[in-house]
């Protein structure tokens, strides 16, 4: 008997209340991704990006668990890549958008979209994100653009990345797949720390 309100609660009702409490879990990353979708549809790109990154970070224990990270990459990030790309594009972060365009899966589409961004926004490209490009055609487009602009610092950085033997497309598929997986993992960690800790 509840002495304050005079309500009697039997033991079965208590068990049902406790089981209902266990069913309602709001620390699930899917909910945050859905909230990000709502913000994206309302054209609030900064908030959408934060909720996408927070939701995916929560699903992967903030990219510390490699198994959860690979599952989340295939389950969420591949499908969210176009929305995250749009968020970066509208937030005037062209280099991050170029890196995310590699997640589209279609290299021709990636190169077309990235070529347009590189030609229009070459002066705003953040060199900190060059290391996360694994597609050689994108690196070649960047190299050609910066050679025309005679930007020696960026040319040097891109040449260092291209000369890395692990990025070679003729490597064994397992080596290249592992390199791409690690690069994606590091990119999402860097993006999350940059955009969630602001």
From Swiss-Prot:
Compartment(s) of residence: Nucleus; Chromosome
GO terms for biological process, alphabetical: RNA polymerase II transcription initiation surveillance; snRNA 3'-end processing
Top-level lineage group: Eukaryota
GO cellular component: a single term: chromosome
Statement: the UniProt record of this protein carries the keyword Transferase: no
Cysteines paired by S-S bonds: none
First-listed, main subcellular location of the protein, grouped into a coarse class: nucleus
InterPro entries assigned: Int8
Alphabetically ordered keywords of this record: Chromosome, Nucleus
UniProt entry tagged with the keyword Nucleus: yes
PANTHER family: INTEGRATOR COMPLEX SUBUNIT 8
Known function: Component of the integrator complex, a multiprotein complex that terminates RNA polymerase II (Pol II) transcription in the promoter-proximal region of genes.
Entry's family note: Belongs to the Integrator subunit 8 family.
Subunit annotation: Component of the Integrator complex. The core complex associates with protein phosphatase 2A subunits, to form the Integrator-PP2A (INTAC) complex.
Protein name: Integrator complex subunit 8-like protein
